[in-house]
Amino acid sequence: MKRLLFTLATCCVMCACEQKTEMNPFFTEFQTEYGAPDFTKIRLEHYEPAFLKGIEEQNAEIKAIVDNPEEPTFENTIVALDKSGGILARVSGVFFALTEADTNDSLTALNEKMAPVLSEHSDNIYLNQDLYKRVADVHQQEREGKITLTTEQHRLLDKYYKAFVRSGAGLDAGKQSRLREINKELSTLGIAFDNHILNENNAYQLVIENEADLAGLPEWVKAGAAEEAKAAGKEGKWLFTLQNSSRLPFLQYAENRELRKNIYEDYINRGNHDDANDNKEILGKIMALRLEQAKLLGFDCYSNFVLDENMAKNSQTVMDFLNNLWGYSLENAKKEAAELQKIMDKEGKGEKLAAWDWWYYAEKLRQEKYDLNEDEIKPYFSLEDVRSGLYTVANKLYGITLTELNDVPVYEPDVKVYEVKDADGSFLGLFYADYFPRAGKRGGAWMSNFREQAGEVRPLIYNVASFTKPAGNMPSLLTLDEVETMFHEFGHALHGMLTKCNYKGVSGTSVAQDFVELPSQIMEHWAVEPEVLKLYAKHYETREVIPDELITKIQNQGTFNQGFMTTELLAAALLDMELHNLTDTDNLNVVAFEKETMDKLGLIPEIAPRYRATYFSHIIGGYAAGYYSYLWAEVLDTDAFEAFKEHGVFDKNTADSFRKNILEKGGTEDPMTLYRGFRGADPSLEPLLKNRGLK
């Protein structure tokens, strides 16, 4: 999610250009209300000078810490380090937001150029021996009882100390030099991997000219495809893309089996076409470099290096957890496949269920078993109604209010900004909502920030997704899955907005990777609670509140298709772990390795991992050896929601406890300590199994 001091996830820069200091908006705090990024003044030519100036500024700040003649203390070393890098934080927050959500060729070129520069700067900090000695000195003082720190201060000190150790500060010069080379190469390879996926997404177009090929598709799907075609200069036709909001409805409803196969296979083979956008060699290099890095730092494999900082602690714990769930999920998935095959057999075509058939026949089975189809409930989920309901839920739980602002600069016209205030009227932060697809936006949904919370400084948080855009007179209508996605990402936003920490290094989502999904995933539970549905689910035309009959159907089908969904998620998590469990990457063919891994697991051919190796962007970014964390956190969130169900989903005492013990604390205490503070006990696996219908 975040890196200390500044984000290194992606980097960049254009050709250098002379720029007067006072003209570059990144050189000082933004001169806007709330200190929000001033997108009216930020231009392409500002980024490189700001990155270089930011590096210069932080180098001076680090030098001041190192040259301080006083004995190292928590304040003059750890706090000073945590506060350093103001310019870098400002430019990184904006630049990396745009490279993910609104990029173009110029930003991509900048990203590629600056990646090694920023990697080198990070190494210059964490391999700085004089700085490391001061940090280690403060760490030793606490260990020996010479200084007394608060729990939050202890966590911050420990985090920085470990960051130096895990960066190789304690290694000899030769090993440090090799680590620098590895870090630089990894940053460049990661950008190339992600760019290839974006290129593949943007290049694919399924253009339909014959309306007969649209058979089975609801009107809202056809209307959206017509708008896509019009925007692409193909008016009078229908255009489908690899974005979830376009691809999944096509797989779910289109009767044309060959076209379903077309869009499905292009999606799952991204990065695997032996062309300029191929990712096989890149991923192989990344795995080899990560393994070398882990071994230099004293670990047998990369997964154990990563997990040493997580709740799970080691690879064996994660593998035991995933394999335990695998038995439950695969058995259910096989039963579901058999049910779908029966529906196909009734059609008398003699066809065998294939992966591109699953969504289509699952929708038929849903209608048969529950008398419910997505097209029936989707009119009740307009984006604006769901948004309103989401904010009402947040208000009823935590007393906060969100008010739309029209005068805060944004990077795209369809981005909306909200002022967030607490029940007492105090300012909590700004929330940016960017919900529609565009060519420069990567797939998926995520939360991040333009500014982190620290002390009196309040955060600037954003959510990004790619929901269907309004088309003509039809508003943006969400699927039930997309409704849950909106609630999920807003849960992350709440974690970032409600945090009350003194130091940015431990605020908000700066927590263990396998804990960070708890605040997001627990929010999904409210999305389909009957009491909550009555608050926001209204027919976009008639304004009728969703009827009890439909709510009952939604509740009844809550565990429908969960064998499939859990199995594809587990398959991806196990692929991630097996790749990073490798202790030898010589002659690694990632596609062959994926097949071998899935064969050993016994994955049925009708299901592919949710992410295959060549487009598994999670493991290139912050979720390497960490994709399991969604399920790990689900153990926590399903158990935690039991507390709400026991006392009422809007029970004030329970909500206050969750806010104070989880959302406000950030990474200031051990995750399990925080969880026990809320729940009063360790989590149980049973609620997860029940929630997914696996037992």
Spans of model-derived segments:
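Short pre-active-site segment immediately N-terminal to the catalytic Zn-binding motif
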Residues: T468-F487
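Active-site-proximal, well-structured secondary-structure segments within enzyme catalytic domains
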Residues: L156, T188, N195, N199-T241, ...
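Positively charged n-region of N-terminal signal peptides that target proteins for export
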Residues: M1-L4
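C-terminal, non-catalytic "cap/extension" segments appended to globular domains
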Residues: K20-I42, H46, K53, A215, ...
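Short His/Asp/Glu-rich catalytic/ion-coordination signatures at enzyme active sites or charged loops
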Residues: Q31-H46, F95-M114, V138-E181, T241-E281, ...
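C-terminal motif of bacterial Sec signal peptides marking the signal peptidase cleavage site
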Residues: M14-A16
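N-terminal helix-rich structural modules
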Residues: K20-P218, L239, F644
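Sec-dependent N-terminal signal peptides
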Residues: F6-C11
